Structure formats: C-alpha cells, structure tokens
Amino acid sequence: MSITKTELDGILPLVARGKVRDIYEVDAGTLLFVATDRISAYDVIMENSIPEKGILLTKLSEFWFKFLSNDVRNHLVDIAPGKTIFDYLPAKLSEPKYKTQLEDRSLLVHKHKLIPLEVIVRGYITGSAWKEYVKTGTVHGLKQPQGLKESQEFPEPIFTPSTKAEQGEHDENISPAQAAELVGEDLSRRVAELAVKLYSKCKDYAKEKGIIIADTKFEFGIDEKTNEIILVDEVLTPDSSRFWNGASYKVGESQDSYDKQFLRDWLTANKLNGVNGVKMPQDIVDRTRAKYIEAYETLTGSKWSH
C-alpha cells in the first residue's frame, strides 16, 4: 500500500505538507511528522510514489537518532515502554481508516524554533559542488585544493549550507560567511562544528558497512530555554544524503548510488529535470525502492520486513 497524502479529517490540524512529510499539530508543544511515499527530485514532486518509502525513511531516521543520541539532542518525544505512538494521539486515529495512514511512518516530535539553514556537509566532491569546482575551483565560495577529481574525498568534510526555500522555490547554495550573516556568527559556527562531527561519526560507521556517505543534509532547531542545538527532521536517509556503493567506488567518475541520484539521472537523460507532472515508469519505481531497501538493510543490519 502506498500513501501519497494523509487525510485525517480535521482530527489534528494540518500545519504543512512538505515535499515528503505531512505535519500535524498534536498540542501546543508537539507535532506529528508523517513521512508519505512521495518522492521529489530537482525540487519537483513526482506524480507517482515509491511504496513504503515513508516507512523506510522513518525507521532509518530512528536508527540514526539513536546512534547519535550521545552526541546531540533530538526532537523525538520519548515513547514509554509498552506504549505506542497511538497512545499519545486522539483515540479516533487508532481506527483502521487513519491507523493505516500513520502506522510505522510517523514520528511524535517536540516543537522547536528552526534554524533557517539547510545544513549540508560534504565529504566527497560531487553534484552541484563538483560543477562549481570545475568552473571556479571553489565549493560554496570556499577555495578548494587544485586537481580534485569527481567523487574524490575532501581532505576534511566541509560545511556547505544552503537557504531553506519555501516549497516550489529552489534552495540556494550559500557560503559559511553568508550563513553567519543569516543566523549570527556564533550559532553558525556551532552548527557547522556539530554537523561535521555528526557526519564524520556516521560516515566512519557506514564505511565499515560498505556504504560511502558522500554528503548529507541536516536540519537543526534550537531550545530557546537552554540554547542547545537540537537535531530535527530526518537524518541520513537516501532522501537527504548521497549513499555510494563502497565496493565499486572509483575516483574520477559518477558512482553507483543507493539514493535519489538514480531517479535524477533518469530525469536528466529524458530532459525531465525540473518538469512538473512527471510519472515515473514502473521499473524506475521498483529499482529506486530496491536501492532504498538495500541501503536500509546494509546500514541498520536489519532485514526489511514490509
């Protein structure tokens, strides 16, 4: 069963529909994040979906939240032993009509003030970073060593932020100096240091499992009482990261990936990048789903059972 859009009939107020997530308000301090099976590429949502993708994103995010729990606070509400998320929601949402839309793809989260940056960390040069480097020798305005090849590892992971665009708009790559202007120098520095630390820990873990995390996008909030930075949204999923096959990794070319790159390549080859109303052929749906599942199983060590 594929869920492309949740309909809760006003039981909880809908706060927003993002590219993938439907967000509902549970109470003044709590939100319900529901990961649908929608998939977007080049800032456009495809007409059809990837079955169970939202469940996979949710389970993988939960895995990484736990993995990083000693390194950073996250926005998850603790679910008491023996309870489920439905014990914290209006009873009506346990009815089959609603439960089937929410089960295994929902996170109950604390509300936090969002830091208005897409916090991207790059360990390897690829994508828009590679294109910029070829033209100017820089990445997000930062001078890079000469002679880097496509897909090569940077000497150190780098913080390359972008703006958080409204849906339908494009995120814009900015320099760390511009990020400091947006959110303040101290907060920008703290976010950059934390993001690089989290990425590095996860990159090392994934490498042992045979997956290279080339880059990823974090989002952070701030606890306005304690000034602590909080890890929010999704974490290190195939939607927010580039995952490469470590066994076939080769510097100087594009890589075999477990993420949306496969879909992006198909769109580009068919001159459909950025075009609205695109329906993916079944084989692209199936192969994208298979790549997401392989990434999940490899990283978590758990068999996909849906």
UniProtKB/Swiss-Prot annotation:
EC class (word): ligase
GO term, biological process aspect, one: purine nucleotide biosynthetic process
Molecular functions per Gene Ontology: ATP binding; phosphoribosylaminoimidazolesuccinocarboxamide synthase activity
EC number(s) per entry: 6.3.2.6
InterPro entries linked to this entry: SAICAR_synt/ADE2_N, SAICAR_synth, SAICAR_synthetase_CS
Highest taxon in the source lineage: Eukaryota
Role, per record: Catalyzes the reaction of 4-carboxy-5-aminoimidazole ribotide (CAIR) and aspartic acid with the formation of N-succinyl-5-amino-imidazole-4-carboxamide ribotide (SAICAR) in the purine biosynthesis pathway.
UniProt-recorded name of the protein: Phosphoribosylaminoimidazole-succinocarboxamide synthase
Lineage: Eukaryota, Fungi, Dikarya, Ascomycota, Saccharomycotina
